[in-house]
Amino acid sequence: MVTKASPAPLASFVSLASILLVTGALGLAGCTPRPDGPGPAAEKFFGALSIGDTATAAQLSDNPNEAREALNAAWAGLQSKHLDAQILNAQYAEDTGTIHYRFTWHLPKDRMWIYDGQLRMARNEGRWEVRWAANGLHPKLGEHQTFALRSDPPRRASVNELGGSDVLSPGYRYHYTLDAAAAGPALSATVHAAVDTLHPFTNALGDPQLLAEQASSTTEPVDLVMLSSDDNDKVFPALGRLPGIVVTPQPDMLPTDPHFAPAVIAGVKTSVMDRLDGQAGWRVVSVNQNGVDVAVLHETEGSPAPSVTITLDRLVQNAAQHAVNTRGGKAMVVVIKPSTGEILAVAQNAGADVDGLLATTGLFPPGSTFKMVTAGAAIDRDMATPNTMLGCPGRIDIGHRTIPNYGGFDLGVVPMSRAFASSCNTTFAELSSKMPPRGLSQAANQYGLGVDYQVEGITTVTGSVPPTVDLAERTEDGFGQGKVLASPFGMALVAATVAAGKTPVPQLIAGRPTAVDRDAPPISPKMLDALRPMMRLVVTNGTAKDIGSCGEVYGKTGEAEFPGGSHSWFAGYRGDLAFASLIVGGGSSEYAVRMTKVMFESLPPDFLA
């Protein structure tokens, strides 16, 4: 029995494109068709069929009922838009004939299926008619079979990190729901089993009795939980076959490592989902009266989408993650490749994760790491050079503000390079006090600080360095207190700027350009020539000596005070790897330095060779 299906409305079909009676034969090909041949009857049959008029076409056959059912099923199974039918050749002898034709079915999504076939004809009481058989629609179509169109979605592309390994790959999540009607009298037992079994995975189900009442009050299934493949393997044997439990596999892109930059990977997934599905393949199959596939009549393979690459580097990310995991509180590290702007790592410990992606969006006073900006501005304005002798008293009064050094240390008069390496607040407070209100704001922009970068796949905020007319505020801004704010992402850009000689445009997803709200003027060569050796001196003979064993590291430490505590900062670079490390409320900068040291020590020995 062929499944009945009505053809599409007549208006949705294109009329017969061409019906060409090429040749007729009475044992001889190439002769002019005889007037009483089967060609005219075949033309009428194809003409009706091509516009979806299956009833008329069926009446031109010797078995109208069976033909109509088969033709309706063919149109429905192919979901066809229209059909072009072309007669290639007509042959007949006495009361039998054969029409050789070419069908072009126009299918959804601009697909076409073209094939040649043969239609048997017979003359009955002087009138030619179609001798109906299923193989008249297609040479390989058997009796009581029809067509079905199958889509073969390509395997979704994966998302890779910079080293080539997958960070997101196609898989399934399993949606569990409860259908009270299907559960019937077993509803209470099913609900109690569901609450007990799913308790390790969700606390949202609550009281079994209330859940049963909720499920009974609606005709729709009630959501229970969404499980990963591994969790489904644990739950399904106990729950999957109970009355009323419905388990629906849902395709998804799944993290290959739940501990690999989870917040970043979640943002990447949202950004790239529309790029991961390639061109679907499709097949036309013959199916029997039970809907079971019998044979493939036509197949077009799909083309998968190319994989998407993100700039996170597994080696760097894992090293940074290991480093932040050694600290309590809220610790984070951002690593950027100065030569390209590629974001190599965004690592946070569990304490930081509670507040979202603090590493790229959290704003904090940067403390003395901001002295990279202040020193650069002073050099660019010809206020000082690394060798200029400047005062580093234990405290200094500027306007109505008294500025102390950490612990009140006093170096007297020293070269600016020494004041930078020892992190003299008083030195840089005095320098900033002599700058114009927009001096530090303009200087910060040269390092990307305060610039808005629309990085595809991740939300970023660099920082804020507002102009300051008030002398006391400008003084505090000079050593990273006051109203100056920066994210670890922003300070990593500052360090990357010194390393590269220009501010790199950050990027996370390969092939997705970053929009920048303004062009940052480059830092000058004299700024670079001064800042680089001063940042190296911080490591060799200053506040970051503890990381001196990790190769040629350049950096600037910072401890930013806030009421009741201080933040621990360290920013810098080594080779083509710039970083910023922050421990919120972590106290002395030595802790951020130690955390950064753990990161470098966790990299392969030859990584920065």
Q: What residues fall within each predicted segment?
A:
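Secretory targeting and sorting signals
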Residues: M1-P33
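C-terminal region of N-terminal signal peptides and the immediate post-cleavage residues
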Residues: T23-F45, T503, F607
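Conserved SxxK-family serine transpeptidase/carboxypeptidase catalytic domain
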Residues: T32, Y92-D95, L211-P243, V247-V264, ...
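Short solvent-exposed beta->alpha transition segments
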Residues: R34-P40, I51-H100
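Small/polar-residue-rich segments within soluble enzyme cores
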Residues: R102, R131-A133, F147-P153, D166-A305, ...
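Short beta-strand edge/turn micro-motifs at domain boundaries
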Residues: D110-L149, P249
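Short pre-catalytic segments that frame enzyme active sites
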Residues: L137-P153, V167-S188, H192, W282-F370, ...
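Beta-lactam-recognizing serine transpeptidase/beta-lactamase-like catalytic domain environment
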Residues: A295, A331-G362, A377, R381-G586
